[in-house]
Amino acid sequence: MSKVVVCAMYKFVSLPDFERIQKPLLIVMEKSGIKGTLLLAKEGINGTVAGSQSAIDALLAWLATQPGLDNIVHKLSFDDDMPFYRTKVKLKKEIVTMGVEGIDPNEVVGTYVKPKDWNALISDPEVLLVDTRNDYEVKIGTFENALDPQTATFREFPEYVKQNLDPTKHKKVAMFCTGGIRCEKSTAYLKEQGFEDVYHLEGGILKYLEEVKQEESMWQGECFVFDNRVAVNHDLEKGQYDQCNACRMPITEAEKASSQFEQGVSCPHCIDKVTDKQRERFLERERQVQLSKQRGEAHIGSDVSAVIESRRAKKEQLKKSQNEKSV
C-alpha cells in the first residue's frame, strides 16, 4: 500500500485578489482526492494537505501557474493513513494569526538560516534561542537551551516579547517553529520592535529533521504537527503521542492509563478545566464518534474551544494578578 504524502506549505506574498483563487483551488484539490486545509489571505498562502504523490505534485504544479505562488516553501512527510477528513480552502485576514497590524514579512524579515548552519548559530553563547510555538507543542520537543514563552496561542507572542525581550540587551535572537511560517512572522515583528540581529530556521523544525542526521541533531523529543499523527519523530514518522480530544494536549500512553483520562472527555492536563456541561457535551460527542466507527465512517467535528478559552482566560488572569503585584 502506497504511503500518504503529507505536504505542509506556505508563502508570504502579496495576493490582492486572493478571493479569486479559492474556488478553482478547491476544485483542483477535490479532483485530485486531496484532503486538508489551505488558508488564503492578502499576505499569502498557508496550510497542510495530504494525498497521493501524483496528487500533491499536481497541486504544486497548479499553484505555480498562479501569480506569486511559484516556489512555495513546502515540506513532505509520510503516513500510512490519511491524516485529514475534509478538503477546505478558507479565506482569512492572516495566514498565521498574530493580531498585529502592519507586520509584513514581504517587506521586513530576519535572516534565514539553513538547517545545516543552525547548530553553529544556536551554539553561540551570545544567541538567545526562542521557541515561537504554543505550550502544548513545546511540551513534547524543542531545541537544546531554547526559551519556552508558554503561550497558549500565537496571538500571545507579541506580549511575551514586550515583557521578556529587550533589543538593548538581547543583541542576537534566533527563533524557530514547525514549518517556518510563525518564526518568519516573528522575526518581522522583532525587526519592527528594534531588534537588529534576528535569525530564523529556514523551513522550520520539519526541514531540520529532514536534513540533519540524528547523531548530529540538537533537537530533543518529537515535533508536534497539526493533523491526526499528533507528532513526528526524527525520521518524520508518526511518533509515540496521542491527543486528548477535549483540550488538544499531546498525551503519552502512561497518561492514557491514568484514572483522569477518559477517551474524548478529559486527560490529566484538563481534568480540572472541564465543566459538567462540557463533560456532557464531550461524552455525547464521543458516543457519536464510536457509532461512526461502528458504521465504518469518519466522524468529523471538534468542540474544544471552551477548554482552550478557559486555559487562555486563566493565563490572562495570572498575568493580571502579577502586574497588579508589581505596581
UniProtKB/Swiss-Prot annotation:
PROSITE patterns: RHODANESE_3 (PS50206). It catalyses: uridine(34) in tRNA + AH2 + O2 = 5-hydroxyuridine(34) in tRNA + A + H2O. Transmembrane segments: none annotated. GO terms for biological process: tRNA modification. It comes from the Bacteria. The active site is at C177 (cysteine persulfide intermediate). InterPro entries: Rhodanese-like_dom (IPR001763), Rhodanese-like_dom_sf (IPR036873), TrhO (IPR020936), TRHO_N (IPR040503). Keywords: Oxidoreductase, tRNA processing. GO terms for molecular function: oxidoreductase activity, acting on paired donors, with incorporation or reduction of molecular oxygen. Residues 123-217 form the Rhodanese domain. It is an enzyme of class 1 (oxidoreductase). Its EC number is 1.14.-.-. Catalyzes oxygen-dependent 5-hydroxyuridine (ho5U) modification at position 34 in tRNAs. Belongs to the TrhO family. This is tRNA uridine(34) hydroxylase. The gene is trhO.
